[in-house]
Structures are given as structure tokens and as C-alpha cells.
Amino acid sequence: MSEQDIQRASLLARVNFPIYCIKSISERHILIGGGGGMAKTGISNPFEIYELTYDPVTNTARATLATHFDVGANAIMNMCVIPSSKYLFELACGGMQGMCHIYDVKFRFKNGLTTNHHDDHSNDQNNSSSNYLRRRHMSLSSQNSIEDIEENIEEYHGPTVEIKNKLKTDSDIHHNDNQDGDKKNSVPNTIPDYIFDFDLKESFQTDFHSDEPYQKLIKYSLNANMVFSAGADGHIGFWQLPNYKLLTRLKAHENEIDDIDIHPSGRHLASVSRDGRSLIWNINNYKLVTSLEHSQVIPKPTNKEKLSIFTNAKYLPRLCRYSIVEGDENNVRLFVALNSRAKLDSYICKWTIQKDQYYMQKIISAGDVPLFAMAISDDGRFLAVGKQTGDIDVFIAFSLQRCYQFSQAHNIFVTGIEFLSTTQASLELVGGDVDAALVSVSVDNRIVLHKIPKRATLGFFGSFLFFVLFILFIYVTMNYFDL
């Protein structure tokens, strides 16, 4: 791994379960969820919260486990955070069986006790979770979908698959940590003297697919004051807060819904599905606003071989995200990612919104690898995608110009990406001198930090020099033509 790669990406943590989702819950805390499902493999189904702190030895962030909480029989496939205060929030999560579970999550101190943290902490986690966390068991049973995912994972981890690993291995990290004992001792690796308590508040069914009910998505909107669910049965659930009252189950699509997102104003909801449709819904009256047509704007490939495939290929919308335009919270755009089942390029489409009308503004190729995850920074400046091959790409949202690329950050497809807060305090944790930072997760059990370097500028001296040269050029030109 090159020095440049180390500066751009680093391994925050390696866990002992597949990770399916990640959320940033404060300027210095991230929450992950996942697990092995109901399969009797000994793999738990937990939430974990990590504290990010600045490490002066490596000039980047380090992650320390603050809380481990096992939810029981079912893996956490998706989640959303409903904040009450800085360290008090409700957590909606779900997956198999089409169930949604609501947890109250509260911050508290451990009586001031701080103990040394060890990398091999699975036994300590189980003991601490039984002492500090309140847990309620749920009797839910479904196994087929989890087993399918595990077969997919085993296929990717098989001996015939060769993976180029650009990240620090555990031995590399151990070697670096022992290079300078004094420096290592100056940054003690300790468990925080606080914890987050998880308390199950309620559970309810959101998906009613006849064969395999599966809640695939759960999203929260502050301005709409609602939580929205979607999954295998093609319906979108509108749940009013604070009591999670079901307002309606909208039959939005004929097939499984792959993604939904909510307009920052809380007026519109975008949904994309395996039925090939990208739809915009009015949240207030549950009516269809418009259908986005992508097929007409996808450019034809110039390669003859790809052109023959393109003729019969079908592009499906896979991901969608609303975003504010940088510097203007009243100006919103929508990004939609398109994948093809054939070996063709994937695309990112940008739609502008004017008076509730959607107009295609730009479309770019994101390479010939399917896109699996998407995130946008809170200031609207950057858009990130995670790919089937484990790659992470970041684009400038305004121009859709790629500004960061890290190949095979994970050994398998990316399941989740999340930008850290763009506040100064949060960026200082990763070493500063960056425009943004994001964290990616996968079923390869790894949490990886990516740092987006500041874009090069001329600076004051460079701008002054450019101005002087420009004036000199004008003078010489005018003198040459006797003007």
C-alpha cells in the first residue's frame, strides 16, 4: 500500500459480523448494523457504536468501540435515526420478516470506569452488553433471504476469487503500532467511560409480501415528521411521528422497491424499483407527481461490441438521493443511479427541480461496474457511490466530475457509505486539510475511512502572479499591434 493510499483511506475497524448499514449519529460517533441472520453460524446480529478520535501518530481518525448491542435472531439490514437531542434518539431498523423495530437509544456514563481496550474483544462485548444494556428478545423467524445472501458472500470469498487489497492488514497495523513505543503510549487505546443504552420500544410489520416479506428501506424526514418504509411488496408505508401511526400504504411499484428518498422540504418522495420505474410522489396527498424517463437520455456506446449489447439491454434505476445545491438550501436536485444487467456502463443522472417540475440536467458514466450504494455530503458538495467490486468513487455534485477514486476498498460489494459531518470539529478528527470524509462498510466486516483532499487553488500569491502576467500579456499585445 502506497503512502498516498494510506493518506487517502485507512481501516477504522474490523468486526466479526457482516455490516449492512451505517449512520453518522454525531460529529464523532458512527453507528453500524448487520449480522449473520438466523443461520446457526455463531455470528451475532448487533448494533455497534464507535467513537472517532484524532490520532496524532497517523494524522487520521481512530475508532474505539463504545457500545455493542445484540438484537437477537434477525440481521439489521437497514435503519434510520430519529434524533431527539445530541445523544438521545430513536432508531428504526428492520429487514427479514418485513418487521420494523423501534429502539430508544440513550447516552449514559459507566460510573466513570474506563478500562483498556483490546482488539480481541468479542467476549468482553458480550459480558458488557449483558451488564449495561437492556434487551428484549423478539420471536421472529425467517431464514431464506439471509441464506441467499450468505451464499453470495461465500461465492465472493471463495478461493478462486483473487482480491487486490490496498488497505492496511491487521499485521501492518500491528507493525506500525509497535514502531514507536513512546508515540503509541501517548495515545492510549481505551474504552470510553460512557455507553449507549438500547431499549426496544415497539415492533410492527411494514412489508406483506406473500412469499418473503422483507423491509428493505426505512427513511426519516424531519420536515414531513414521518418515517417511510418500503420493501419487497412494492408498497411505501407512511408512518406519522411520534406514535408511528400508519397513514397509508401506497402501492407504488409492481416489483421490489430498491430505494427511496425524501425531498428536504418534506413535500416529495422519490422511489426506484426493479420494475424499471423512477417515480415522484406527493407526500401530502399520496398522489403521483411525475415519472422520470431515463432511457431516452442514456448515451449510446461508441464501441461496436457494446453497441450490439446496448440495443437489447435494459437499464434499471437502483439508487436515488435528494440534495441541496451548495450554498442554497432552497435549491434542490435529485440524483438517480442506473445499472444494466448487461456488461455496460452504469450512469448517474442529475435532475433539477423548478416549481415541482423535474428536468434532466446532466448524465455521466460511472464506469462498467454496477452501483450498490450512494451518499451525499450534508453541505451538498459531494456525491459518493459504492460499487459491486468494492470501489468507492466521489464526485463533485455540481459538475459530476470525479474527484476521488479508491479501487477495491472492500473485498466484496459495498453495502453502505456515509459522509461524516462537514463541521470543522468533525473534519479535524480525520486530520484536517480535507474537504470531506466518508466511511464505507461491507459484508467483508470492515469499516473504512476515506478522506477527500482539498481541491488545489492558486492562493493569494498565485492569483496575484496570474493577474500581473495577464496585464503584461495585454500590454505586449497592444504594443505589438500599435494599439
Label the predicted regions.
Residues 42-44, 48-51, 100-105, 236-240, ...:
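WD40-repeat beta-propellers
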